[in-house]
Amino acid sequence: MSTIQYDMLYLLSCGVNKTKPQQNILEQYKSDDRKLMQLYWFSKQHFVDALTGTGLKQAGVTLPDPWEKDMAKAVRKVILFDAERARILSFMEQRGIWYLPLKGIILKEFYPSVGMRQMSDNDILFDEAFAEQVREYMVSLGYEVISFGKGNHDVYEKEPVYNFELHRALYGAAHDNNWEQYYRDVKERLIREEGSSYGYHMKPEDFYIYIMCHGYKHYQGGGTGIRTLLDFYVYLESLHSEMDFAYIEKECETLGLSEFEKRNRALCRKVFGDNAFAELPAEERVPDTAAHTTKEIITKALSQEELDMLQYYMTSGVYGTFDRRIENNVKKYSKNGGSSKIRYVIKRIFPGMETYQYYPFFYKHKWLLPVCWLYRLLRVVFQRERRERILREADAVRKVKV
């Protein structure tokens, strides 16, 4: 990790803790446009450029135009999503459809100001018995149906920015079976929103467990970026005193998340905590020397295992990477011995039944699965895009060290 990336972590800590960055850190970016653009690029890669940009701007740093525009777009996007979501939830209220806003819809409220917590979509769990009615309504609003009846959520998109993932279930057959069973009857654990007939929310502990579970899903898949760790910190910092950690630890143990939760709880506080950078040198220290202080402080505070975990977050980008997803999937097959690469290839050619949910006809008529295998093969042969993706996947598998 570069010193600029460590500075980014420091600025994120300042942003969520509402503290002004030290002047000797700011001077580096006021006087060096190249470093400022690198900081922007790293922040944008992790979808936290609105947060770092706001802190810099409030401290007197002049931002490049693209950064200013991204910050304005982040605020506008939240405002547009909030209004559109209110309309959709009003429809659900009128039709007697229970619903549960998820993920960023909730988390953004724990950040200091509008637009600081950026997101590309809105996720809502709803009563799947009304999926057809909801689809008709979304189409009437001008949405394109990107996906319907495949997996555990339906996807709707509309210009200029709208992307709604409407979940029939929190987890489905393609996910960990333990998670799918745990969340199958999630409505029984929900709390009705005050002033609403059909809107619900999770109690703080359950929401924390859910975002930890969601974070782990991405972490062990293609990876997930530093925003995930920041979300953990912001939520913990806001509600820590109210939460029952004995309950959290018990439920995380049930879900197989115990070690992941404990490591992240410690790591996020060490990286973003209010006192994480208390050892930064005094303002009179010269800028050239101060350039390395954020890196020194973090590397000193973390164990090697924690540094490795932080590095994993920092090299994953906001939604993970293709190569990392392939690597993690291949390594899953090494646990039981044998050639993990061969087992991975066989699984890709002859996938489990969860995959066939994306082929409704074959999922319904399972005796025709051999035809589906041939269909999948022919698509690779005759569709250039799929062929290129398979070649890229094969190259990624080849590079995996097991």
Where are these regions (language model features)?
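Conserved NTP-donor binding/palm subdomain of two-metal-ion nucleotidyltransferases/polymerases, i.e.
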Residues: 1-120, 126-402
